[in-house]
Curated annotation (Swiss-Prot):
<dbReference type="GO" id="GO:0010918">
    <property type="term" value="P:positive regulation of mitochondrial membrane potential"/>
</dbReference>
<dbReference type="GO" id="GO:1905377">
    <property type="term" value="P:response to D-galactose"/>
</dbReference>
<feature type="coiled-coil region">
    <location>
        <begin position="406"/>
        <end position="435"/>
    </location>
</feature>
<dbReference type="GO" id="GO:0046580">
    <property type="term" value="P:negative regulation of Ras protein signal transduction"/>
</dbReference>
<dbReference type="GO" id="GO:0006915">
    <property type="term" value="P:apoptotic process"/>
</dbReference>
<dbReference type="GO" id="GO:1905232">
    <property type="term" value="P:cellular response to L-glutamate"/>
</dbReference>
<feature type="domain" description="Dynamin-type G">
    <location>
        <begin position="93"/>
        <end position="342"/>
    </location>
</feature>
<dbReference type="GO" id="GO:0072705">
    <property type="term" value="P:cellular response to mercaptoethanol"/>
</dbReference>
<dbReference type="GO" id="GO:0071456">
    <property type="term" value="P:cellular response to hypoxia"/>
</dbReference>
<dbReference type="GO" id="GO:1990910">
    <property type="term" value="P:response to hypobaric hypoxia"/>
</dbReference>
<feature type="region of interest" description="G3 motif">
    <location>
        <begin position="199"/>
        <end position="202"/>
    </location>
</feature>
<dbReference type="GO" id="GO:0031267">
    <property type="term" value="F:small GTPase binding"/>
</dbReference>
<keyword id="KW-0053">Apoptosis</keyword>
<keyword id="KW-0834">Unfolded protein response</keyword>
<dbReference type="GO" id="GO:0071394">
    <property type="term" value="P:cellular response to testosterone stimulus"/>
</dbReference>
<dbReference type="GO" id="GO:0010628">
    <property type="term" value="P:positive regulation of gene expression"/>
</dbReference>
<dbReference type="GO" id="GO:0006986">
    <property type="term" value="P:response to unfolded protein"/>
</dbReference>
Length: 757
């Protein structure tokens, strides 16, 4: 068991050691590759985030249901950020590490590049001088090609000789021209990591140094000065890098003292020459250019032989040993020096390229993310404030709605009671006034003046005009007695209703309440209809002697009983049956008992029946009276009776007939009008009730409109609050996403841009 455990531990240890060795042996150029991949991913996420934010802001700005929570300027700003991020992403996708090699003609710049690429990519050696700028980059294809400046034509190049021939045959190329040599990545692993090497003509063959710097050097991450170790640094070389230092802040410069293999022929002077070159190069970098300090200068100056390294690496690529062939003494030291240069160079260019290529864009990305975050934060705050305002407005309207419902219920009960009381009072006033007017009906009838004639035609017209006079007079008198007071009370009641319900209406409606609630001039209509009421009136304007038998009976018994007596009804007077059921607790009346009035009617009826049957009664009565009082008294009585008859007959004129007609009409009309007192009072009270109920209904209609508006506003507020909640959540999410992107950028800065301690 312990053996198995120890074996497992050893396996884990071996795996960890291998992983560590892989990390150690990994090319520093991978740092740039991973940084580029990381920053491209961040910018891709940033672009998607800004696009989402721009769409969200635009939709929010176009939402007319909400109050403005964002401005058009903010929408345009975010859209501008989107275009900037897309532009930066395109630039980052094309970014690569760039190293520029400079030096005098035939110092071995092309040989150094070939040695670093482990292959003879560029023409070099005796008879080959670079007459233009050569940009060496990698391609995923399997065939090499070159592109000349201003042309998209890919010229196939399979060998170095073909490349050299193509460069020399192109007459349009000059020292300031650029030719891109695209070499397959499969042949040069160094090019896989996005490294571009720039070869240049000798800086001692042209005076256009400024244009070279502007055109080819401003985006270079590292400059390599390839010097000839057999001579010292020339003023031309120094002048060029002084110009570079003026254009760029602290450029990364390496100095390669090439052809150091020549020192092997004079080993006794090797260290002295090396020390002199080191001092002069250090002084140039530290004192003249000020790009490094003295402690760092040793890592920027190297003594190499590019030709030896290239030869050894080509032999190794072909399967032969590195040390094969005639190599000068100290080759391994120079090989190690060149490898050390490559290591320092890769570390420097990866750090420098990440910083120069990504730092500015990273800072810009942080600024954009922060700007969008601030916009989302302001939108979140504005939406929150608007939501609080909407909640307050909704609560206010809900309170207002509850207040209206409660007040309307109380006012409805109160006005219902007051309307009932007022209608009862109106009915009482109208009934009382009508009863008084009926008692004064004779005065109104006496005021009627029109020619009277007993003929039926004239009498009919007389009746119709009298009916109209009575109706107009009663209506006028009733109006004078009741209408003004009732109308005043009604208007007061209507105004009380308006004043009571006005607080329930909006301010804008209160000022227009008189126009919204129709208030016509109220006038009571009594509708007596005297013509129909007295249509059955039958006048009796024939002459009737006051002491005649009919008048005497009528005077003592009344009109109804006199007709019964004179017309000779049955002797047996039947007692009418009661209309209501008899009370069983009371003893029943005897069948034979009669009232005094009924007994008198029965006696007179019997007497009239007796005189009508025989004339003997007259003789008997006359004889009795004759014997009792004597003939003189009887004659005198008959004489006076006759004179009275003649007087009454002579005074029975048209005027007397008119008075009799009016007296009979007053009696008849008074009786009929008494029957409709209650109806007229109820009719007037109903009119008042209808008017007041109509006014209250119109006011309630306006209140209902106000309630409906409040309910609609509350529903709109609820919808608005939901929209603001969604808006607030989305703005908060986007704000937090901006913070997350900022943390990703900070992590990138910490991991790739800040110097390691």
């Amino acid at each position: 068991m312990s053996l198995l455990f120890s074996r497992c531990n050893s396996i884990v240890t071996v795996k960890k050691d291998k992983r560590h060795m892989a990390e150690v042996n990994a090319s520093p150029l991978k740092h740039f590759v991973t940084a580029k991949k990381k920053i491209n991913g961040i910018f891709e996420q940033l672009g998607a985030y800004i696009q989402e934010s721009a769409g969200f802001l635009e939709d929010t700005h176009r939402n007319t249901e909400l109050d403005p929570v964002t401005t058009e300027e903010q929408v345009l700003d975010v859209k501008g950020y989107l275009s900037k991020v897309r532009g930066i992403s395109e630039v980052l996708a094309r970014r690569h590490m760039k190293v520029a090699f400079f030096g005098r003609t035939s110092n071995g710049k092309s040989t150094v590049i070939n040695a670093m690429l482990w292959d003879k990519v560029l023409p070099s050696g005796i008879g080959h001088t670079t007459n233009c700028f050569l940009r060496v980059g990698g391609t995923d294809g399997h065939e090499a090609f070159l592109l000349t400046e201003g042309s998209e034509e890919k010229k196939s190049v399979k060998t170095v000789n073909q490349l050299a021939h193509a460069l020399h045959q192109d007459e349009q190329l000059h020292a300031g021209s650029l030719v891109s040599v695209m070499w397959p990545n499969s042949k040069c692993p160094l090019l896989k990591d996005g490294l571009v090497l720039m070869d240049s003509p000798g800086i001692d063959v042209t005076t256009e140094l400024d244009s070279w710097i502007d055109k080819f050097c401003l985006d270079a991450d590292v400059f390599v000065l390839v010097a000839n170790s057999e001579s010292t640094l020339m003023q031309t070389e120094k002048q060029f890098f002084h110009k570079v230092s003026e254009r760029l802040s602290r450029p990364n410069i390496f100095i390669l003292n090439n052809r150091w293999d020549a020192s092997a022929s004079e080993p006794e002077y090797m260290e002295e020459v090396r020390r002199q070159h080191m001092e002069r190069c250090t002084s140039f970098l530290v004192d003249e250019l000020g790009v490094v300090d003295r402690a760092q200068a040793g890592d920027r100056i190297f003594f190499v032989s590019a030709k030896e390294v290239l030869s050894a690496r080509v032999q190794k690529a072909q399967g032969m040993p590195e040390g094969g062939g005639a190599l000068a003494e100290g080759f391994q030291v120079r090989m190690f020096e060149f490898q050390n240069f490559e290591r320092r160079f890769e570390e420097c260019i990866s750090q420098s390229a990440v910083k120069t290529k990504f730092e500015q864009h990273t800072v810009r990305a942080k600024q954009i993310a922060e700007a969008v975050r601030l916009i989302m934060d302001s939108l979140h705050i504005a939406a929150q404030e608007q939501r609080v305002y909407c909640l307050e407005m909704r609560e206010e309207r809900q309170d207002r709605l509850r207040f209206i419902d409660k007040q309307l219920e109380l006012l409805a009960q109160d006005y219902k009671l007051r309307i009932k009381q007022m209608t009862e009072e109106v009915e009482r006033q109208v009934s009382t006034a009508m009863a008084e007017e009926i008692r004064r009906l004779s005065v109104l009838v006496d005021e009627y003046q029109m020619d009277f004639h007993p003929s039926p035609v004239v009498l009919k017209v007389y009746k119709n005009e009298l009916h109209r006079h009575i109706e107009e007079g009663l209506g006028r008198n009733m109006s004078d007695r009741c209408s003004t007071a009732i109308a005043s009370s009604l208007q007061t009641m209507q105004q009380d209703m308006i004043d009571g319900l006005k607080p329930l209406l909006p301010v804008s409606v209160r000022n227009q309440i008189d126009m919204l609630v129709p208030r016509q001039c109220f006038s009571l209509s009594y509708d007596l209809n005297c013509d129909k009421l007295c249509a059955d009136f039958q006048e009796d304007i024939e002459f009737h002697f006051s002491l005649g038998w009919t008048m005497l009976v009528n005077r003592f018994l009344g009109p109804k009983n006199s007709r019964r007596a004179l017309l000779g009804y049955n002797d047996q007077v039947q007692r009418p049956l009661p209309l209501t059921p008899a009370n069983p607790s009371m003893p029943p009346l005897p069948q034979g008992s009669l009232t005094q009035e009924e007994l008198m009617v029965s006696m007179v009826t019997g007497l009239a029946s007796l005189t009508s049957r025989t004339s003997m009664g007259i003789l008997v009565v006359g004889g009795v009276v004759w014997k009792a009082v004597g003939w003189r008294l009887i004659a005198l009585s008959f004489g006076l009776y006759g004179l009275l008859y003649v007087y009454e007959r002579l005074t029975w004129t048209t005027r007397a007939k008119e008075r009799a007609f009016k007296r009979q009409f007053v009696e008849y009309a008074s009786e009929k009008l008494q029957l409709i007192i209650s109806y007229t009072g109820s009719n007037c009270s109903h009119q008042v009730q209808q008017e007041l109920s109509g006014t209250f209904a119109h006011l309630c209609q306006q209140v209902d409109i106000t309630r409906d508006n409040l309910e609609q506003e509350i529903a709109a507020m609820n919808k608005k609050v939901e929209a603001l909640d969604s808006l607030q959540s989305k703005a908060k999410l986007l704000r937090n996403k901006a913070g997350w992107l900022d943390s990703e950028l900070n992590m990138f800065i910490h991991q790739y841009l800040q110097p390691s301690r």
